[in-house]
Curated annotation (Swiss-Prot):
Name of the molecule in the record: Small t antigen
Species name: WU polyomavirus
Main location: host cell
SMART domains: DnaJ
Protein's job: Promotes efficient viral genome replication by accelerating both G1 and S phase progression of the cell cycle. Inhibits host PP2A by binding to the A subunit, thereby displacing lower affinity regulatory B subunit. Inactivation of PP2A in turn results in the transactivation of cyclin A and cyclin D1 promoters. Late during the infection cycle, ST may induce dephosphorylation of host MTOR, leading to the inhibition of cap-dependent translation. May establish and maintain high levels of viral genomes during persistent infection in cell culture.
Amino acid sequence: MDKTLSRNEAKELMQLLGLDMTCWGNLPLMRTKYLSKCKEFHPDKGGNEEKMKKLNSLYLKLQECVSTVHQLNEEEDEVWSSSQVECTELCCNFPPRKYRLVGEVYGDVFEEYILKDWDICLKGFYYLCNCFYCFLDKRHKQKYKIFRKPPMWIECYCYRCYREWFGFEISAETFFYWKKIIFLTTMQGVGLTR
C-alpha cells in the first residue's frame, strides 16, 4: 500500500480512525471504523467539521488508490491459471465468486487451504504445493520476474509482502493476522479468481 497515501497521510488517517498503524492495510476493519467515525465527526451530529473533512479526503484518496492498484492487478491476471487453486466444495459454484470474501467461499475448509505445512511451505521447499501461502508466494515471484520490481502489500497479498510492509518477523501471531486479512478480503482482491 506504499502507492496509496504518504506515510504521514497514512498515520493521520489511522489516527482519525482510532486505529493503530499495525492495522494499516486491513481494509475491512478500516472501512468499519471509517463509517463509525463519520457518524461521530459529522457536523450535524455535533462533531468536528475539520476532522470530518480531513477524514473524508484521506479515506477517499485511499479508496481511489486501492481501486487503481486492484485494476492493475486485474490486468496481470494472465500470469496465473485459476485451476492452480480450487475449492471442490459446493459453495464455490455460486456466482459471482470473485466478489465474495475468501472466508465465505472456503468457509470451514479455509484452514486446510491456507497453509499445508508450516516448516516446508515457509521455507519454500515444496514447489508443487497449492496452498494459499505457496500460491501467493509463487505469484509474488512471477510478478517480480515480469515487472522487474518487487510487488508490495495490496498489489500482492502474500505473507512476505504483509511482513515486509508492516515490518513483522515470521511468527505464529503474524501469520494468524495475515490469514484473518485473507479470510476477510474478496477472492478477486487477493487474486484467487478471475
